[in-house]
Design a protein with these regions (language model features):
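Transmembrane alpha-helices and adjacent helix-loop boundaries
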Residues: 1-218
Length: 218
């Protein structure tokens, strides 16, 4: 089998542009997911029963359904409710953020519960409220412990973001599909796409490892 290196060279800039969009989607989704996950994770541990109940429903629903279905719900079902078309970028970020938020909520919950209960009791004995103790004592310690699973979530979303290609959003996978539709060189293009994903995952894993070692020394 002869590889078309000229085609690979000419297609590579387009694929790299798609990879940049993939990184953008992942960063935004995990960023918003952090905000959602932090609030939901704390809500699952608070003393307000209604908040705990709603947080549990959200986490169970998102973790119990596929990201692809969630993308379809936002892109195809939501317009029927709001009466207007949903932009693919908005649909991609919304679905991925909501999905990531549920998994990050579990990461935060596990991280908080890994801190000794005596820390909360010590904070309360000093006159701090539950929220103040959580903010100033529990969360700083928990955050150091959740860096590795947060890195794993970023890597998972980096790969899972390829699912937004089904709504026509031109990230890395969709760019590969469009090039193949024009050139019929499926092997060369998919190998390039796979290698780009591999490099991105490797770089993220290395970065997370550096962060983890940095926090361990503090």
């Amino acid at each position: 089998m002869n590889l078309n290196f000229d085609l690979i060279a000419s297609s590579f800039p387009l694929l790299l542009a798609g990879a940049a969009i993939t990184v953008e989607i992942t960063a935004l989704s995990v960023g918003f997911g952090l905000l959602i996950g932090c609030m939901v994770g704390i809500a699952r541990l608070c003393n307000v029963k209604a908040l705990r109940y709603l947080a549990n429903i959200y986490v169970d629903f998102i973790r119990g359904t596929s990201l692809l279905v969630q993308i379809f719900l936002v892109y195809f079902a939501l317009p029927g409710i709001i009466g207007s078309r949903v932009d693919p970028f908005f649909a991609a970020i919304s679905a991925c953020s909501i999905n990531s938020g549920a998994y990050i909520a579990e990461i935060f919950r596990a991280g908080i519960q890994s801190i000794d209960q005596g820390q909360m009791e010590a904070g309360r004995s000093l006159g701090m409220t539950w929220a103040q103790t959580m903010r100033y004592i529990i969360m700083p310690q928990a955050f150091k412990r959740i860096i590795p699973p947060l890195g794993n979530e970023f890597i998972a979303m980096l790969k899972d973001s390829s699912l937004v290609s089904v709504i026509g959003f031109e990230e890395l996978t969709r760019r590969g599909q469009l090039i193949i539709a024009r050139t019929y060189a499926s092997f060369e293009i998919w190998m390039c796409v796979a290698l780009i994903y591999l490099v991105m995952v490797f770089l993220v894993a290395r970065f997370v490892g550096v962060l983890e070692r940095k926090f361990e020394t503090k």
